[in-house]
Amino acid sequence: CCPTFGGSGVVATELGISLSKRGHEIHFVTYKQPVRLEYLSNNIRYHEVLVPEYPLFHYQPYELALSSKLVTVVKNHKIDVLHVHYAIPHAYAGFMAQQMLAEDGISLPMMTTLHGTDITLVGSHSFYKPAVNFSINRSDVVTSVSESLKKDTLNIFDIKKDIKVVPNFIDIANLSQSFEDCQR
C-alpha cells in the first residue's frame, strides 16, 4: 500500500489490523511504515523497501526493489496470499514477485484492490495505462472500493477480470464522543 493518509494506506492498514485481531499474521511491505499503523506485534510486521541510490538511474527503480522485497518476505515468512493496494506500482510489482517465486516452485495468489486515482488519474495516463491494464488482468482477484470506481475501471481499461466491489468502511466503534458533540 501507499503508507500515507490516502485511501489505499488507510484501508490497507485498517484491514490488516482487523485481520490481525482475528489471528492472521499480517506483513506490510512498503517504503515507510503506514501512518495508521501505530504498533507492531507478533502478528503485525512492517518490512521497509529500501531503494539504493545508483547514479546510472535518473529515477531509482522502486518497482524492482518492491518486487524483490516481496519475494524475500514471502520466502522468509511463508506468506499465503499477496494483497496489494493501488494498481501502480503495487500490482505490477506483485506480478513480478509472483513470476520470480514461480521460478522456485512457489505459487502465490494475488488480490489487487483499486482505490481511485490509481485508475482515474495515474493509471489512465498513456505512459502507465498498458502496465495498469496488464497488472489488473494478471491479478487473481480484483476488488474496487466503490461501484463508481468499478465502472470507471471498466470504461478506461480492457479488463477481463471480474471486479468485486468491497466498499470503504468506517469502524464506528472507533469514533469518539467528541464526534457526537460536534453533531449538536
Specify the residue positions occupied by each region the protein language model found.
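Histidine-centered beta-alpha loop that forms part of the nucleotide-sugar donor binding/catalytic region
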Residues: C1, L114-T117, P167-N168
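N-terminal subdomain of nucleotide-sugar transferases
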Residues: C1-V35, L40-H47, V141
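Carbohydrate-associated surface elements
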Residues: K32, S148, F169
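A short, charged, and often flexible helix/loop element on the N-terminal side
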Residues: N43-V71
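An aromatic- and histidine-rich active-site surface loop
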Residues: V81-I106
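A short, histidine- and acid-enriched strand-loop-helix "catalytic/donor-clamping" loop
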Residues: M100, I106-H125, V141
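Acidic anion/phosphate-binding donor-loop and adjacent secondary structure
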Residues: V122-G123, L154, F169-Q183
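Membrane-proximal helix-turn-helix segments that form the acceptor-binding/catalytic region
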Residues: H125-S144
